[in-house]
Design a protein with these regions (language model features):
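Intrinsic-disorder-linked linear interaction elements in eukaryotic regulatory proteins
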Residues: 1, 33-35
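N-terminal secretory signal peptides that target proteins for export/translocation
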Residues: 1-14
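N-terminal low-hydrophobic presequence detector
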Residues: 3, 21-22, 216, 387
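Positively charged, low-complexity intrinsically disordered regions
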Residues: 5, 28-30, 382-385
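Generic N-terminal simple sequence motifs
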Residues: 7-8, 24, 31, 40
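Hydrophobic alpha-helical elements and their junctions with loops/disorder across both membrane
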Residues: 10, 23-25, 151
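Bacterial N-terminal signal peptides
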Residues: 15-29
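Hydrophobic small-molecule pocket/channel-lining residues, especially in calycin-type beta-barrels
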Residues: 35-387
Length: 387
């Protein structure tokens, strides 16, 4: 729950996140890419890091919030504006992720934000990625952890063309209240200037969980760009095929079968897709956040996996006539290539998505990831869940 200036911090790429999936289902690669253990290198053993997967559980629910936003934190001026609003936080990925939506009113009118929290089990850290309704651009994540009931996450950023460190802090945590503060530092973290301060009090009359997120939407015009993903809402049986070694001439593929659930969030301006599948090498999970930018009339798509615990560089594109295509440029094996991710409607009950790479400027494309979706009817969902 915060607002930030534009940042130049580097994010992991969409390809690097999808590569994690390829690694998960490729046992030979796992052995090759496994990090050198401290004992193998002759280094002294270190205590294992504390599992922080449940550190943000206090944040779940519906909250009333009072916000003070400092207009120029680095000037030392106390001038600020105040806002009042509501924060709703839902659990995702069995607690390894959270989705937060905030609405607030202030002197400059109505303001909304969307925050995705992701836990990295390898580093035992959380990442915090934010979208503002006014900019609709994903901010690079803050990363950090909790210690003694206090959470601190950090990032490098810029404020009015000045390089700063950014810190978000959760403190004074009780079952029905907590304090959140975002601060800036120009001196390497020696001193911090508050920029965004919020006090949150639980609304005991309301609850929030993943089932509250709309799994469908009322029919809307498919010609409207902002409704380009309407066909995708719901639960889908998913068959996935992944090329194990892209751009190498290899024809070795691996298959997985699972389910994808796509839910509308943020009043329809964004949606969240959760995929869980199983193949010969085990269980795979993937989360995709897609959001519409009303300023550019474009859609963005970003991915995360449990092993990475962080969103990457988003693909950017448009949806038209039931087909959405996203592009970005990334470095693969030391070479820059184009990446294309496409998803399209086949019928009311079927759809398909593909990822492809091009190393010749888009003249030719090699598909490396194919997902085929079949809609699960409400009666089938009840039978699958055992209800």
């Amino acid at each position: 729950m915060f607002t930030r200036a534009k940042s130049t911090a580097k994010l992991p790429s969409m390809y690097s996140l999808s590569l994690v999936l390829l690694m998960v289902i490729s046992q030979p690669q796992l052995a090759f890419l496994a990090p050198l253990k401290a004992a193998d290198a002759g280094a002294p053993a270190t205590p294992s890091a504390r599992d922080g997967q449940h550190d943000f559980e206090f944040n779940l629910g519906v909250w009333h919030t009072h916000i003070r936003r400092v207009l120029d934190p680095l000037s030392g001026s106390p001038d600020s504006i105040e806002l009042n609003g509501t924060v709703t936080v839902r659990k995702l990925w069995d607690g390894r992720a959270q989705l937060e939506e905030i609405e607030a009113e202030g002197p400059k009118g109505h303001w909304e934000g969307l925050t995705l929290f992701l836990y990295n089990p390898q580093s035992h850290q959380w990442s915090q990625s934010f979208l503002s309704s006014r900019m609709a651009a994903l901010q690079p994540p803050l990363v950090g952890s909790f210690n003694a009931g206090r959470g601190e996450l950090f990032a490098q950023d810029t404020f009015r063309d000045r390089s700063i460190l950014l810190r978000s802090v959760w403190s004074d945590i009780t079952p029905d209240s907590h304090h959140y503060e975002e601060s800036y530092s120009e001196d390497g973290g020696r001193t911090w200037m508050p920029a965004f301060v919020a006090q949150l009090t639980r609304d005991r009359d309301k609850t929030a969980d993943a089932s509250d997120i709309a799994a469908g939407a009322e029919p809307m015009s498919s010609e409207q760009e902002e409704h380009g993903f309407d066909f995708d809402f719901g639960t889908w049986k998913t068959h996935s095929s992944r090329l194990m070694h892209p751009l190498t001439g290899s024809t070795a593929w691996a298959d997985l079968d699972g389910y994808t659930v796509v839910r509308r969030v943020w009043g329809g301006r964004a949606n969240l897709a959760e995929y869980k599948g199983d193949g010969p090498a085990g269980h795979v999970e993937l989360l995709a956040l897609r959001w519409f930018n009303p300023n550019t009339h474009e859609w963005n798509i970003d991915f995360a996996t449990p092993n990475v615990g962080m969103l990457g560089i988003p693909g950017v594109g448009k949806c038209k006539n039931g087909r959405c295509e996203f592009y970005d440029q990334e470095q693969i094996n030391g070479r820059y290539v184009l990446v294309r991710f496409s998803i399209w409607k086949i019928s009311d009950d079927s759809a398909q998505s593909e990822q492809a790479f091009s190393d010749d400027g888009g003249k030719t494309w090699e598909t490396n990831w194919i997902n085929k979706y079949t809609r699960v009817k409400p009666s089938e969902r009840s039978a699958r869940s055992g209800t």
